[in-house]
Every structure is written in structure tokens, then in C-alpha cells.
Amino acid sequence: MSVLGDLRYALRLWKRYPTLVVVAGLSLGLGVGATTTMYSVVNRVSHYELGFKDVDRMVIFWNTQPDKGIDRQPPTWEVVQALLKNGSTFEAIGLAQFGGAPVTLSGAAESSRVLQMPVDVNGLSVVGVSPLLGRTYLPEDFEDLIKQKEARSIVISHETWQRRLGGMEDVIGKSFHVDGEPRTVIGVMPRGFKLVPWEDHIAFWAANDLSRIPQARWMVAMGRLKPGVTVAAAEAEATTISRQVMEARGDKPGTTKARVEPLHQAFFGRPEDVLTFLLGAVSFVLLIACANVANMLLAAGAAGSCRSC
């Protein structure tokens, strides 16, 4: 049967059984819509592209203390330095304050409240994403920071560069004010760059000197493992070094243990099993809808046959 013939048959069916056509259309529409939506969610979560270099080697490093009910505790500055100096599993570790901090950015077209994300010297470079303009932080930036007691340079987002600074080509080296203090732009990150997937509104990343607060637990540690190193090996070494640092401070390690998680898992957990189950359940609903529509069409066909007898 041609497409034109199918259309004529559909119109005849619509005139004869308008209620059936509406119910069948709604049933199939809801089933297909729900299945498509759930598939999109599963696909997005399972295949979310972080955009980082060698993301399979990227991890987040926590400390846990089960005896104190602590499941995720950021490592101290001392532990991070000990891992980089004495360890053999981490290529780099960067620290960043997730969540950002509200500040006032002025000196552009107009003053506005924005979010900054404090980072250490490796906080941006650890993910392996090159800036669109300029550079990210270098050790000498932090030497100046220690002398001046405050950050003097910032790396801005592409959105901030375009929307708040007019996309000026000579933005590198320009000075603006953050909460009334002068700051110099040293880099612009690429469009769409996010250190954390759910933080879309970070205006810039600001240098922070953690050496002044060596035992602070306010940052999240993102690490890059050396090639060939497994998560289990990194976790074992991090546990040993964390306990050694605590003992050197005179603290009792107790049940302290490192927890090293692949970055994608740390950000999104393990939702695949649950989402796949939900996708299967929704697909089953679509199957039921198709069966119901088929039964309604068969019943309508049988009724039409009886009337023609």
C-alpha cells in the first residue's frame, strides 16, 4: 500500500473511530516521549564529556575516617605536598574551592556581582586544558602572592571576557577591580570550560596561597595519575602518606584511609545501573502502549467486519 493509501485509510479510521485514534495517538506519544527522554538522560550522564586531557587518569582524592563518621574529607595541604614529593603515583594534584565565592567585579562596563573560584598553582593546569588567551598560573605567581599577601592575577572565563569585558583582544594584562582591589588578567579559558560540570557561572579563577594555612581542609583535590598507575595503587599510597603526615604532627591516624575516585565517578556517582533500570521500565511501558493500540485496532477491525456481515 502506498503512502497516499495509508493516509486515506487513516482518515477513514479517524472519521469512523475518532476516540480510538485520539487514545492511540496519546498512548504512543506518551510512550515514545518518555522512552526518548529517559534515553537522553542515560546517554548524557553515561557519556558526559568533561573535556579534560586524559580524563581516564583524572581522580578526586579524599580522606575518610570511619571511626569519626567522616566519609569525604579534603586532604590537608601537608598531605598533598607529601604525596607530590615522596609519592610515585600522582603526576600532579590541583586544589580548588568548589562552589565559588561571591565578589564584586568592577572596572569594566559596569560593576557586577560574580562568582570566583579560588585555586592553587595546579588548580587549572592539572586538567590539561590550555587557555584560549594568555596562560594559567605559574609557581612565580604564588611567590608574588606570598610576598604581597593577596592575589594580584586572575584567569577569566570565556563568558566573562565576552559579556562583561566586551571581548577585547588586548585583555591580557588589563587590570580590573575585585572587591575594590586591583587584579590583572593573565589568561582567558576556552568557551564552555568548567572545572566542575555543574558550576556554569564562575567568572574567574583566583590564586590562593595554601601554605599559610597548611592544615586547612577547604579545598577539593583533583589529581592526575601517572601513566599505568591504577586507582587502587594510588589509594594505597595516599593512605600510607596521609597516616605518616598525621603521625608526624602528633595526631592519631585511627581509621584514616584515603579514598581515590575516578573523576567521572566522583562527579556523577554510579547512576548507570539505576538509570538503565528506569530506561527498561519506561521501554516496557512503551511496549504495553503498543500492545494496547494493537488490541484497539484489532477490536475496531473486528467490529467493522461484523457490521459488514
Where are the language model's segments positioned?
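Residue-level recognition of transmembrane alpha-helices
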Residues: 24-27, 180, 281, 300
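Short amphipathic beta-strand/extended segments in non-transmembrane regions
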Residues: 60-63, 77-139
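Alpha-helical transmembrane segments
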Residues: 30-59, 298-301
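Interfacial "coupling" helices/loops that link adjacent transmembrane helices in transporter permeases
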Residues: 289-309
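Short, strongly hydrophobic transmembrane alpha-helices
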Residues: 17-45, 286-291
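Membrane-helix entry/capping segments
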Residues: 1-20, 51-53, 66, 110, ...
